[in-house]
Amino acid sequence: MVDARKNAPEQPPAGGWGALNATERQLARQKILVKGNRALLNMNKPGGFDCPSCAWPDPVKPHKAEYCENGAKAVAWEATAKRTGPIFFSEHSVSELRGWSDHALEDQGRLTHPLRYNRDTDRYEAVEWASALSEIGTINRQLDPDRIELYTSGRTSNEAAFLWQLYGRLLGTNNFPDCSDMCHATTTTALPESIGVGKGTVTLEDWEACDCLFIIGQNPGTNSPRMLALLHDMAKRGVPIITFNPLKERALVKFTDPQSPMEMLTGRGQAITSNYYQLRIGGDIVAMQALCKVVIEADDAARVRGDARIVDTAFIEEHTHGFAAFADYCRSLDWNEIERFTALTRAQLNQAAEIYMRSKRVIACWGMGITQHRNGGDAMQQIMNLLLLRGNIGKLGAGACPVRGHSNVQGDRTVGINKTPTEPFLQRLDRAFGFTAPRKWGHDTAECCEAILRGEVDAFLAMGGNFFRAIPDTERVSAKVQHLKLTVYVATKLNRSHLTPGEHSYILPALGRTEIDMQAEGQQTVTVEDSFAMVHGSTGQLKPASEHCRSEPWIIAQLAKGSVADRAAIDWDALVADYARIRDKIEAVIPGFDSYNARIAQPGGFHLPIAARQRKWDTPTGKANFLFAAGMMDEDDDVPERPHYQLMTIRSHDQFNTTIYSYNDRYRGVAGERMVVFMNQDDMARESLTEGDLITFRAVAQDGLERQVSGFKVVAYDIPSGCCAAYYPETNALLPLSHRDVRSNTPAAKSVPVQIVAQSAGTPVESAPEVSEQTPEAAGLISPLA
């Protein structure tokens, strides 16, 4: 059901009672109403556990309830009372389970036993830990390490990720496809070219001092809801919040703070965005350059008049390189072209630039609306150019803020999950563990998929995640997995990737972030790094889902003992008995972790050093660089004369990555379904479509392969003409592996060229998800909250 009234201007604010009700409903669905609410009071606080959802930082003084709606859903999903044990797998074949929806698979509950796939029965069967580990080790020892892939999910702790990279390098490979390859790897690769570091430069203290905020290609209401509390406070004190985003997102329009009694009583909420610019998909590069053009030309005029300069000349002269060439390029840009490629008017862009020029301390945020483009790195560098013009970096209240979407995705990279390790890192690793790590660069996610397609992979080992559902070209790649000799999935819940077994396949049940991790020397704490480079501890509070679940560090240690015990004199049992020993090794290998164990004992943890915060630039020029690609105007200019739309793939509000909590998207007025396409009304008229019509997407790709998915229901929405949006992972099959950012190989999932074809009555719906009989919606027990 889609209620168009929910998309109207008078729609209620985000947050408020809707968020509280949705939280309690999810806890009830997972049968942990009391237990779950008690656990939430310990989340994101010293001595408690870190949210397993997004990577937003914790405040110095936490609220009594320091969690958001979607963080609570993640906890409910992990701490559920439901279980997926051996009896379930004896009743359902893998072939049958492939017909289930993503939601239904995970909604069966927590995995309770190690499992081994039986090809004869087409079922997973319980297996003893010792047998599974021995068999995996035997197979791994026989393989060429260049044909082994080790995947890492973003919620993996620092301790587990460090052991995982150590295990992989002892095997002899740098093949480390990582979930960040599908989201913020663009930040990690492009930002260092500008400022010498691949992380954000701001802290929460900067947010409190900021006098202007830019939000570009991000939807915090769904992806980082705790960020809304800061946006709420900033808007309340009159800070201009400038949003560039194709879709009008409700949480960026108005938000009711659930922790404000007055707002909860009145339901009025706080307006968030002061200026909302709905630019065309792929228009970010030109939009940012247009703002720079206005600033530079205003500075030119001020210089001629003898007035105070608009750009920060002292900062530019001392700290930057390439300004003159960039300024000349911006001056040359034509406003007719700018308006055509951005779908914004000159007046709108002038307005945004005027606000920027009046402000003294500006923060710019971005999400995957920037990183998931073919030229995402170039777009990000234009954001940096805008900040550099007025010295908005390395001072209080200003800087760059990439908002990462998974709890420890930044930390995993920091501790060594990297296909291209530096020589200094490898030398420190060699000294710390007494072996010689491989120097040959490995695979990222896209390269791993390409290697699978070429038949060059024998083993795929996944530390969490849902790799074969999250990737582009899902159908092509997944079809090849059956030919792999080995697949190993460390997981908390059943998901679609587990239904693509290799010749030998295992599912190993892991503890979740919320659960007590008891090892030989007592209860353990793990650490994570948030989006602001703050490292802090996380200590589970709940009883494990099963006596057979094991911690990720323990699982890795046992895998290593079975595969690489003879390659270095490492006491794996001692490392796992007390994770402080793992942290000692991290301190020895990774710069910035001095006194690691002592500092995580402090409430809130510690910040890793970010050189650009001190205006130190680790770049070839020794300065921050103005970078641009001349003539790069459009995301879409390589498919001329082929009429198509630009599709952006998005999350629903009841979704975290490939995890689907329900079929509702409250903030967009959708309830009980996911197979929808959000379209501009003029485009609907052009295609002779009306609300509720079914369409087929056909990808417009350069490789000549046919990609299409069917059964999407048309929904009229506030989105620029020529653009449309639909949920992933249902649309991932449309995305070619080759359609990706040129630096990072991040899939260009926010700008997929597609044709929209109306389905005639009776056309079969190929991809519509089935609602499991076990879901409350299907049983009629709970009305979808809209």
Annotate the PLM regions.
Residues 39-45:
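Short, flexible, mixed-charge glycine/proline-rich loop motifs
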Residues 52, 124-212:
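Long, structured ligand/cofactor-binding scaffold of large enzymes
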Residues 28-38:
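Short Cys/His-rich Zn2+-coordinating modules
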Residues 573-665:
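Long, low-complexity segments enriched in small/aliphatic residues
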